[in-house]
C-alpha cells in the first residue's frame, strides 16, 4: 500500500517489543532523525511517563507505531499488541498517530548498523529510526478518525 508523503512535523517513532520500546524522533522539517534510548516495558505501563517526557522535551506533535505484519501483509500476534499499545498511548498522550508496516525492520537495522546480539535496546531504537525514515518517505499522514486518534490498518 502506497501513501502520500506526510506533511513535515516533529514525530516520535516507536518499535514496540515485548521487553523494550525502541524510540527515534525527527526534526520539524523531517530532515534528520535521531535515536533515543530504548525504554523498558512495565506491566503497569509506567514507561508512558518516560515517553511523555520525550514528547515534551522535543516538542513532538504525534507519533508512529511500527506494526510487524507477516510476509503476506497480515496481522501477527505482535502486530495486535503494537496496535493496542499505540491506541493506549494516543489516549494517554492525547496525540495523533499512525501505523507503519515494520516487517523486517530489526533485521534491516542489524544489517545496516552492524548491531548483533544487542541487549541494551540499541537495535530497537535503530529499528524505530528505520520505521521513521519509512514514514517520512511514504506516510500515511497522522489522523484522527471518529474522535479516536488512529489509522485503521
Curated annotation (Swiss-Prot):
GO terms for molecular function: nuclease activity. It is found in: Cytoplasm. Its main location: cytoplasm. Its EC number is 3.1.-.-. The keyword Hydrolase applies. CDD domains: YqgF. SMART domains: YqgFc (SM00732). Keywords: Cytoplasm, Hydrolase, Nuclease, Ribosome biogenesis. It comes from the Bacteria. One of its GO terms (cellular component) is cytosol. It holds the Pfam family RuvX. GO terms for biological process: rRNA 5'-end processing. InterPro entries: RNaseH-like_sf (IPR012337), YqgF (IPR005227), YqgF/RNaseH-like_dom (IPR006641), YqgF/RNaseH-like_dom_sf (IPR037027). Belongs to the YqgF nuclease family. HAMAP family: Nuclease_YqgF. Could be a nuclease involved in processing of the 5'-end of pre-16S rRNA. This is Putative pre-16S rRNA nuclease.
